[in-house]
């Protein structure tokens, strides 16, 4: 059939024939040209067009490499039969327990615990985890078990008891007491004197020692003077022991009567500001009453040095500071 004329050429119009490769229809003349071309394109693998790379050209956007698909992990075989059997055993055990409770008989033993074989057991705590959790847990549990074992070795002794913390005890101060004065466990408690007694109506600070050479003033010696006076006191006690008991009693009675007279006279003649105060059994003058005396640098009770010149009390034993 003759068709229309285009550019002076005559196009023949006939039956359309389909292509064997792509299935499209062509004229017989066009089909001869299309056949080899279509065969090449079919055999050649066509590349996938990446539109994102074309869009990123000429811009600052970096080209992203396509991610490779991860291989799927192999599927583990399902243990549905074992799970089904465990489920049936659990239901039977529950029914048996209910029946035993109703009848009042002996309770049946509990079913054995079921474990997932896919889980990994920790060798330290005997718990089970999946593969990902087991890798993290086993390392942590290993360090913790080693830390606890080392801590137990140091904290327990051979008997298994925890070691007690050592307590700090300061070294006791050595005091040289005269032989006539008995030593006491606590220096802060008042100690009754063996050679002097307190008179009713007279302040306790008025009491003075029999061995005092002054008579009307309390005996206040520093630690260095005490050490020197100790041998003399020991010699006096030896001399006293050589006298008969009857003479010793008479002499003590005479000394007590003379001491009472001197104490009453001194108490009446002394002004109000110059009195002695008794603090914890120790005779000491008030600092406020008479500030003209000499302040010792060491405590008369425990021998501790005063940290400052204006201290009124000892920082170690708490005894009031004396005035010499």
UniProtKB/Swiss-Prot annotation:
InterPro entries per UniProt: ZC2HC1A/B-like (IPR026319), Znf_C2HC_C3H (IPR049899)
What are the Low complexity biased-composition ranges? 176-187
Phosphothreonine modified-residue sites: 243
**ZnF start-end (C2HC/C3H-type):** 15-44, 118-147
Q: Where is the composition biased (Basic and acidic residues)?
A: 48-58
Cofactor annotation: Zn(2+)
Q: Which residues bind Zn(2+) 1?
A: 19, 22, 34, 38
Lineage top rank: taxon: Eukaryota
Which positions bear Phosphoserine? 222, 291
In this chain, the stretch annotated as Disordered covers: 43-83, 149-225
The entry lists its GO molecular-function terms as: zinc ion binding
Q: Where are the transmembrane segments?
A: none
Residues that bind Zn(2+) 2 = 122, 125, 137, 141
The residue ranges flagged as biased composition, category Polar residues, are 188-198, 206-223
Q: Which UniProt keywords apply?
A: Metal-binding, Phosphoprotein, Repeat, Zinc, Zinc-finger
Belongs to which family?
Belongs to the ZC2HC1 family.
Q: What's the protein here called?
A: Zinc finger C2HC domain-containing protein 1A
Q: Which organism is it from?
A: Mus musculus (Mouse)
